[in-house]
Amino acid sequence: LGETAFEIWATPGHAAGHLCWVAEEARLAAVGDVVFVMGCGRLFGDTAPQMWRSLSRIATLPDDVTLITGHDYTASNARFARAVEPGNAAIAERADEAERRAAAGTFWALTTVGEEKRTNPFLRAGEPAMMATLGQSDPGASFARLRQMKNDFRG
């Protein structure tokens, strides 16, 4: 894109053949349906371990990298994140912002790696507190449990 060089990363998990375009020097990554604001894509034919590896790879990017996501499911994702981590003040603040943006009809599909590390339960699946909350000892199993909980979530 212009003078910006992108690396193409294979990021399976959401769907076979899913790719992300990463320009770390430009602090930009087009992540499609792997990461959403406070969420992640469903698993359509791929596996939870594949998705966990893809999310974990994206999480290695610097915190100030802007993520361009594929959809705006932020309001629903925020309700789920708040239900999973009711004591997380960063999630509560961001969930309130999601409600305001949804009420105003504002599309929200840009975020940063740092914001997602603080407020996205799927990127937090490997943290000891999250694994303990979910009764899991393995980050991949913790992610799989969260993904199933989100699939079943009606909040």
Question: PLM ranges: what are they?
Answer:
Residues 53-66, 75-155:
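Accessory terminal helices/loops
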